[in-house]
Amino acid sequence: KLQILYTQIDRGGPNEPTFETYSFGLDTNDYFYPASAIKLPIAVLAIEKANLLKEINVHNRFEIDSGSVYKMGVLVSPDSKSGYPSIAHSIRKMFVVSDNNSSNYMYDFLGRDYINKRLWNIGFKSVRMRHRLSLQLNEKENKTTSPITFYEDSKILHHQQSRFAQLPLDVNTKNLLIGKKHYVGKKKKIGPLDFRSKNFMDLHDQHELIKRIIFPETYQADKRFNLSDDDLSLLRREMSILPRQSDYPRYAEYDKYYDGYCKFFMFGDTKQEIPNHIKIYN
């Protein structure tokens, strides 16, 4: 299966882009697993929700209670400058090395219902956010968020109780039985994997999401995210930064965290450095 969307960008003048989009094999009803691409809308919504709450910002530290899906809780982040987790630090790790735990923390901050409703309301109708990443959890556990508290020093800025998702999510695609064998944990199972309970976001919506981040001025106000210029700058910076360019966390092992580690376009099959004149946003 191969689906491609390509948009040619022409500029008639400053801030006057025009788009010409071409597709190959595009079928928005044919299921494919979005994998870590689902982290982009999660990052966008996390920044936006922090703005809406007003009492917190993306740099405030947070804690996730013990006894949740994270049995020991989430209290510290030794690889951050402050030593604590924050929305901004989580987003850095999500984009630079595709860190699943950081994405899951933002899933808990947002909640399943919030993610789906907000994305539907702004026009991304294909989205079906159903689960966290790389955790063996049942449906009830994925519907339940963990309590999370934001602090400034020792002062509590915002506390969010555990929530249970109520929004029914239908199956909106075809061909959901994929493959001939699959793994459940470490056990190999004969037969296709059933993707009816997996995340989904079609290629068209993923493509549109990128355009709204890079070219928000080309969309009407009700189709834009509630992000300031500073928010967009932060988001674009984290989308494009390479592991060797990150200070916190520091990824010193180039053989492991090479430039193409998460930049598959053009450089996904090589460990050579990406030239300075090329920036890849994903």
Tell me the role of every PLM-derived stretch:
Residues 3-7, 41, 63:
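Soluble periplasmic/extracytoplasmic beta-strand elements of cell-envelope proteins
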Residues 33-58, 62:
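Active-site SXXK
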Residues 1-26:
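A short, well-structured edge-of-sheet supersecondary motif
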Residues 52-83:
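Short, glycine/proline-biased beta-turn/loop segments that scaffold the active-site neighborhood
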Residues 26-34, 91:
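A short glycine/serine-rich beta->alpha loop
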Residues 65-77, 121, 231-247:
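Short, mixed-charge aromatic SLiMs
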Residues 196, 217, 221-282:
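Conserved SxxK-family serine transpeptidase/carboxypeptidase catalytic domain
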Residues 67, 78-215, 219-222, 227:
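Active-site-adjacent helix/loop patches that line small-molecule binding or acyl-intermediate pockets
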